[in-house]
């Protein structure tokens, strides 16, 4: 048996096309163009590439690109003041502070200045609290992208034995909360889990966000299970994930590749969040 490969590029493309169509309809209906304010402090090359991709996607979706670039030596107070100005600006639907910020800045405190209604990354304490309580709000992009992939491939979650490997604030914990919200029967594993492979073998859905290359092999996968690989590691052979792809594809029923699986979903869900934020701000629709 060889797994069905989950095509994250195709799913992300469909999400982005739908968002672009809905943005056009929203502008026709309200006269308002959703706007995304990306904030980059400093000149870190990787961060600049990430922000550039988000800005291009924003424009392609018909949204306003409200990018702000500050020098690396900008003070905490000046970055905070900019975020406060963006929070008060009705032209700004969503705010994204690119992390990490330069040394000497408190990234968590800065992110905390973004109001929940404009927190398109879903990272503020308020947004995390809304997610934990199952209340409407903007959800973190990568975790919500994982759910979108599962839905797109008709993976049943309600009552399904599901394991999440990893408990990071960016992926592991929020995707666990989203899965619980979909009534999955959930187990969370981490670095102290005893006999990780045995626990994972009990899962019909396995989400791996451990941050360790090839931590999951064929021995950790139930035959026919759906496996979502969130990891991304640069190696001499190219990008690799937390899952041993070649071994696991012979056991799993469905499997995301790296690259081309979860990765493309992150920007797609960022665009969706920005549209949802704009809709909520006008009372026409919004996060649910």
From Swiss-Prot:
Transmembrane segments: none annotated. Pathway: One-carbon metabolism; tetrahydrofolate interconversion. GO terms for biological process: L-histidine biosynthetic process; methionine biosynthetic process; purine nucleotide biosynthetic process; tetrahydrofolate interconversion. NADP(+) binds at residues 166-168, 191. Gene3D superfamilies: Leucine Dehydrogenase, chain A, domain 1 (3.40.50.10860), NAD(P)-binding Rossmann-like Domain (3.40.50.720). It catalyses: (6R)-5,10-methylene-5,6,7,8-tetrahydrofolate + NADP(+) = (6R)-5,10-methenyltetrahydrofolate + NADPH; (6R)-5,10-methenyltetrahydrofolate + H2O = (6R)-10-formyltetrahydrofolate + H(+). It comes from the Bacteria. One of its GO terms (molecular function) is methenyltetrahydrofolate cyclohydrolase activity. Its EC number is 1.5.1.5, 3.5.4.9. Keywords: Amino-acid biosynthesis, Histidine biosynthesis, Hydrolase, Methionine biosynthesis, Multifunctional enzyme, NADP, One-carbon metabolism, Oxidoreductase, Purine biosynthesis. One of its GO terms (cellular component) is cytosol. Pfam families: THF_DHG_CYH, THF_DHG_CYH_C. Catalyzes the oxidation of 5,10-methylenetetrahydrofolate to 5,10-methenyltetrahydrofolate and then the hydrolysis of 5,10-methenyltetrahydrofolate to 10-formyltetrahydrofolate. Homodimer. NCBIfam families: PRK14186.1. Belongs to the tetrahydrofolate dehydrogenase/cyclohydrolase family. This is Bifunctional protein FolD 2. It comes from Frankia casuarinae (strain DSM 45818 / CECT 9043 / HFP020203 / CcI3). The gene is folD2.
């Amino acid at each position: 048996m060889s797994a069905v490969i989950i095509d994250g590029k195709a799913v992300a493309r469909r999400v982005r096309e739908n968002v672009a169509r809905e943005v056009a309809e929203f502008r026709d209906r309200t006269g308002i163009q959703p706007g995304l304010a990306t904030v980059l402090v400093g000149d870190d090359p990787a961060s600049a590439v990430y922000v550039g991709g988000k800005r291009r996607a924003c424009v392609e979706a018909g949204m306003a690109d409200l990018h702000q670039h500050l020098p690396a030596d900008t003070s905490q107070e000046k970055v905070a003041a900019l975020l406060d100005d963006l929070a008060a600006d009705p032209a700004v639907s969503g705010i994204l502070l690119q992390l990490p910020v330069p040394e000497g800045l408190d990234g968590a405190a800065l992110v905390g200045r973004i109001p929940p209604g404009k927190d398109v990354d879903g990272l503020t304490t308020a947004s995390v609290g809304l997610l934990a309580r199952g209340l409407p709000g903007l959800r973190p992009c990568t975790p919500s992208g994982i759910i979108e992939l599962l839905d797109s491939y008709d993976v049943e979650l309600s009552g399904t034995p599901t394991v999440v490997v990893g408990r990071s604030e960016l992926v592991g914990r929020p995707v666990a909360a989203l899965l619980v919200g979909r009534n999955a029967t959930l187990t969370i594993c981490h670095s102290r889990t005893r006999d990780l492979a045995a626990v994972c073998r009990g899962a019909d859905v396995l989400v791996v966000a451990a941050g360790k290359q090839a931590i999951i092999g064929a021995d950790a996968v139930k035959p026919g299970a759906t496996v979502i690989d969130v990891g991304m590691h640069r190696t001499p052979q190219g990008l690799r994930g937390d899952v041993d792809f070649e071994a696991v594809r012979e056991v799993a029923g469905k499997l995301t590749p790296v690259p081309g699986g979860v990765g493309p979903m992150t920007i797609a869900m960022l665009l969706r969040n920005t549209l949802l934020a704009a809709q909520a701000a006008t009372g026409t629709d919004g996060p649910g």
